[in-house]
Amino acid sequence: MNCLLKSFLVGLAGIQGVTLMAESRPKLVVGIMVDQLRTDYIENLRGMLSQGGFRRLMDNGVYFKDIDYMVPGGDAASASAVLQTGAYPRQNGVAGEKVFDPQSKSLKSVFHDDTYIGNFTNETYSPSSLRVTTFTDEIAVANKGKSKIHSISPNAAQAIVLAGHAGTSAFWINDETGRWSSSTYYSRPPVYLQNQNYNSPLISRLDTMRWMPLRKGEPYPDISSQESNSGFRHSFSRSDKDVFSLYKSSPYVNSDITQAAIEYVTGLGLGKEGEKTDVLNLGYNLNVYPAFSNDDYKFELQDAYLRLDKDLERLFNTLDREVGKDNVLLYLFSTGYFTEPKTDTETYKLPGGIFSVKRAVSLLNAFLVAKYGNGAFVDQYANGHIYLSKNLLEEKNLDPVKVAEESRDFLVKMSGVADAFTLADISSLAVSHLEAQRRAIDPKTAGDIILDFNPGWTVVDDSRYPSVNQDNKTTSYPGPGFIMGQGLSPQVIDETVEAVEIAPTLSRIMRIRSPNSATSKPLTLK
């Protein structure tokens, strides 16, 4: 009898423990992805940062100084997908924001889906291409679908990743109109951003925006006193065809996203209703302002960091006041890459050159025509991937593997090409040195030949209008990450941490299951 009673009490204690653990879960999870955030910049600016923004994360959170995504050629969407799913593009299906569509023979969003209609946009998107669950999805499952899950980002693909499959809403800024946009995939979009489109549209505010130094006349690190005193000034003209792109690369987009986030927290009751956990995921930008073509970008970039620091302080203060700091789990991570403007190679006599996509495709097609007869053998070039015409190869009864290998061997001889691989090369487990490439591609959307370019070379995609320039720079900059919440002690982790370890770690903190494609073990935190 005593044994039975003892067993019952142990079991009851276990049940109560589980209940207490569930009740002590955070009421609100706030996830922030900062595109191109660099550790060296926040460390260099530490003395100028406010106590309530980045410094609060650095001093009171778990501070990862180097998050490695382990894949080349990332962007905001693919990096967010790796961090949210704990899996690489090969598994999660998001190798980049744009993919080649063989039907239209053009680039489309990785999340293009004609099944749904756009809200305030002609774009038709859904998360159906995201093939695995996310950390956010698992929160929804653990809370039996009761969680409110919202995401806001300048970028459509990133907003969709951050909302996951179970998202209540996802909003982004339309590249053509500057409107806050969404998809009918999301059934309960908040009215705040919809009202902004009517009451305070971006197009009506652009002419009033003037970007000048936040601390004019004060010294900025590595900026001469003459530059600091003269400052800088950028305006946004509605007549500029690139005005929305410029806006989305300026600190103003971060401030607008912060204001929207604050309205969500105060107006939607996030983290205040019942015993469930709500989610608010945000995307911020710290990429180089597009107006620059050389090393003169550092003044503006440092200023963008200081402005984002103020935005974070404003957001954190709202969370403290509305939800309570002990009720919030907050994480902020860099996307782990940095796109620098091209250095003036001619002035400094540095190695480099220009790789013309149009010329390369034309030469490759001429080479294949000489071997196999007339036809357009190349369908498209996109981000280092060359897509051969499957229809033409089938029509001519050609072996696609052989043609891809011949194309690879032809392209690798071109100036500026460091190496070339077929999809079969990369997919072969026997080729160990291609492991990073293997992780980075989705075989369902990858090209037949993938090119690597020499550092210092500019890839000019002049096969489409307007042409797109991509500077090939292999220098790596550490990107930081932070996790802050009740029960986590401040600590600094200097060792490199793989991005795929973060979702399992966050899942352990939340005491929920990891995303279904995450195989890494959770990190042990204090």
Predicted ranges, named:
Residues Y41, Y247-E273, N287-V328, E406, ...:
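A long, amphipathic alpha-helix that forms part
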Residues E43-N92, K148-I152:
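Short, structured active-site-proximal loop/turn typified by the sulfatase FGly-forming signature C/S-X-P-X-R
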Residues Y88, G96-K276, N285-F292, S415, ...:
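His/Asp/Glu-rich, glycine-adjacent segments
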Residues K65-V82, S151-I160, G283-N285, S334-G336, ...:
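Short, solvent-exposed turn/loop segments enriched in Gly/Ser/Thr/Pro and often Arg
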Residues R38-N44, I67-Y69, T121-P127, F244-P251, ...:
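Second-shell loop/turn segments in exported
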Residues R359-L398, S467-M510:
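Substrate-binding rim/cap in mid-to-C-terminal beta-strand-loop elements of soluble/periplasmic
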Residues M1-R25:
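Bacterial Sec-dependent N-terminal signal peptides
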Residues D75, E97-E123, V132, D137, ...:
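Secreted, luminal/periplasmic, and some membrane-associated catalytic domains
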